[in-house]
């Protein structure tokens, strides 16, 4: 093989090796849906935020204060209170793919079964004892659970239903980081039984193998 052909072969191999990196998937959406429009009048950036002029950016755009303060859980029907720190609280998080929450749990309080459609979550227990877990997808439906104490860490994979329960004798506190500036949250009970407009009770009755009257009562409770 002469030098010219060798040179072309090397270029071909380099191009082939970089091809998988060039064929990348679309970025994950940061909102529930994005309807295509032909004019910008009713358009919205996919990440949900317009960018501030870099010359006007200040340190306060990257700052939030108050996560050291406990939140009351007494008024919560599930005995917990979630303080969210995402792009709506810290504008500087826009496009950075990360956010944070503080979760306060009363005695016997819980963060009920829910899912984050756009984020993996890593949770750190600061105070107390939590029983936590997540479920794998159908058909296995495996429950992965663990009892966590102060300093313990647990990961909830993106999109999977998970929960935390305070099983200690004192209030508990945890901090969690999520891999999205706007991870979203779907609380299973609230979504199914508190949807607007409400779903036909017969649909849920068949799905859960319950009397429709039970579903109607649940819809009244969550609605």
UniProtKB/Swiss-Prot annotation:
It is found in: Secreted, Extracellular space, Apoplast. One of its GO terms (molecular function) is manganese ion binding. Keywords: Apoplast, Disulfide bond, Glycoprotein, Manganese, Metal-binding, Secreted, Signal. It comes from the Eukaryota. One of its GO terms (cellular component) is apoplast. Residues 1-24 form the signal peptide. Coiled coil: none annotated. SMART domains: Cupin_1. Residues 65-216 form the Cupin type-1 domain. CDD domains: cupin_OxOx (cd02241). InterPro entries: Cupin_1 (IPR006045), Germin (IPR001929), Germin_Mn-BS (IPR019780), RmlC-like_jellyroll (IPR014710), RmlC_Cupin_sf (IPR011051). Glycans are attached at residues 81, 145. It holds the Pfam family Cupin_1. Disulfide bonds join 34-51. Gene3D superfamilies: Jelly Rolls (2.60.120.10). Mn(2+) binds at residues 114, 116, 121, 162. May play a role in plant defense. Probably has no oxalate oxidase activity even if the active site is conserved. Belongs to the germin family. Oligomer (believed to be a pentamer but probably hexamer). This is Putative germin-like protein subfamily 1 member 12.
């Amino acid at each position: 093989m002469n030098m010219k052909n060798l040179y072309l072969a090397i270029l071909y191999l380099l191009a082939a090796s970089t091809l998988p990196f060039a064929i990348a998937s679309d970025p994950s959406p940061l909102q529930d849906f994005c309807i295509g429009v032909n004019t910008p009048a009713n358009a919205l950036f996919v990440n949900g935020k317009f960018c501030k002029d870099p010359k006007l950016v200040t340190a306060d755009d990257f700052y939030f204060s108050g996560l050291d303060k406990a939140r009351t859980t007494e008024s919560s029907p599930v005995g917990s209170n979630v303080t969210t720190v995402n792009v709506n609280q810290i504008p500087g998080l826009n496009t950075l793919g990360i956010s944070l929450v503080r979760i306060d749990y009363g005695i016997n309080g819980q963060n009920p079964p829910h899912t984050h459609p756009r984020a993996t979550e890593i949770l750190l227990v600061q105070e107390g004892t939590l029983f936590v877990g997540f479920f794998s997808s159908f058909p296995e439906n495996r429950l992965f659970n663990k009892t966590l104490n102060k300093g313990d860490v647990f990961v909830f994979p993106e999109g999977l239903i998970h929960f935390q329960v305070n099983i200690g004798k004192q209030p508990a506190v945890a901090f969690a980081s999520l891999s999205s500036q706007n991870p979203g949250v779907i609380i299973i009970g609230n979504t199914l039984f508190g949807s607007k407009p409400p779903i036909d009770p017969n649909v849920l009755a068949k799905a859960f193998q319950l009397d429709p009257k039970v579903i109607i009562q649940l819809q009244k409770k969550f609605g």
